[in-house]
Amino acid sequence: MASISVDQIRKAQRANGPATVLAIGTANPPTSFYQADYPDFYFRVTKNQHMTELKDKFKRICEKTTIKKRHLYLTEDRLNQHPNLLEYMAPSLNTRQDMLVVEIPKLGKEAAMKAIKEWGQPKSRITHLIFCSTNGVDMPGADYECAKLLGLSSSVKRVMLYQQGCHAGGSVLRIAKDLAENNKGARILTINSEITIGIFHSPDETYFDGMVGQALFGDGASATIVGADPDKEIGERPVFEMVSAAQEFIPNSDGAVDGHLTEAGLVYHIHKDVPGLISKNIEKSLVEALNPIGISDWNSLFWIVHPGGPAILNAVEAKLHLKKEKMADTRHVLSEYGNMSSVSIFFIMDKLRKRSLEEGKSTTGDGFEWGVLFGFGPGLTVETIVLHSLAN
């Protein structure tokens, strides 16, 4: 007869404390574009300068985004080398894939190296890898390629998330939380890498959503180290604790945000009702997440919100009567980098913790103890994570 029960084995396998974010790293392609200059570049490089009315409309779209600058992998030279990317809806999936399967892991590696350096521990301690990207589906995936680029153990346990979209930063943290809390001693490297080659399309009057995307999206990568029971004796310093994580889709929101992989790349649609759908349903998510803690004052929280666009942020702010400063870090990231899909929330988290330290705030969360992180994406899907800040 066995001397130990399954229950005892399971208890020994689990961590004692909550999952924590131990380090954050970010990266962008070196080429950046000022938003004010992008309409001229976009219509010139696609040889559509004759479409003056459409260009004027695109300029107005760019102005409404509140974006000042974005980083993009696609340069004029790269576009000219691949003329099928410049022709509206021309077959070009292979061209896009050839670039994406190489560049997505490379950009992810840049962010990962920064997170690992901040963490300060040997790469051999990384037990799990979660890699997420909207584009570049391949087998083996970007998780495998990046593990090799980083020199991770061949036995690292990998999870690959493709084509999740803008909510997937929250998805990655939710999965990392479960892995950290159910595997004692686990250290999870999360990587999100987004490059917009997959959704680049020439301007056309029949594809307004595509023009919105050309004005809104940017390229970037992020990485975190997640683990429970941080070992402060060896220098692990947690930034945030993850208290709860939930995912739901908004009822009756089919088709609000969707994307379809075609011969011409990823074609997506963003319904004009998205800001209203999110703002009408966000309080329900807040109540469900924060009732157990006894919090009902939304201004007593620090906020990390996916910057889907200014209309979404304005609608959420108005619905919840949030003070302007609550979205300041989110708006800063939108302004300086654009919407980087699943990557954006990590740039905001990084900005929040660094600003809190620079301004002498008592906690990593702008001096507040509790906070929320929201991801919004296709579905409409909402990811809600409750965070607990730590002393600076």
Curated annotation (Swiss-Prot):
Primary residence: cytoplasm
Coiled-coil intervals, chain numbering: none
Highest taxon, organism lineage: Eukaryota
Spans through the membrane: none
Protein name per UniProt: Chalcone synthase-like protein 1
Function: Chalcone synthase that may use malonyl-CoA and hexanoyl-CoA as substrates but without producing olivetol or olivetolic acid.
InterPro entries, A to Z: Chalcone/stilbene_synt_C, Chalcone/stilbene_synt_N, Polyketide_synthase_type-III, Thiolase-like
Biological processes annotated in GO: polyketide biosynthetic process
EC number: 2.3.1.-
Tissue and organ distribution: Expressed at the same level in leaves and in glandular trichomes.
Catalytic-site annotation from UniProt: 166
CDD domains xrefs: CHS_like
Encoding gene, per UniProt annotation: CAN383
Keywords: Acyltransferase, Cytoplasm, Transferase
Gene3D superfamilies documented for this protein: 3.40.47.10
Signal sequence range: none
A Pfam family matched in the record: Chal_sti_synt_C
Annotated localization: Cytoplasm
Family that this chain belongs to: Belongs to the thiolase-like superfamily. Chalcone/stilbene synthases family.
Enzyme class: transferase
Gene Ontology CC: cytoplasm
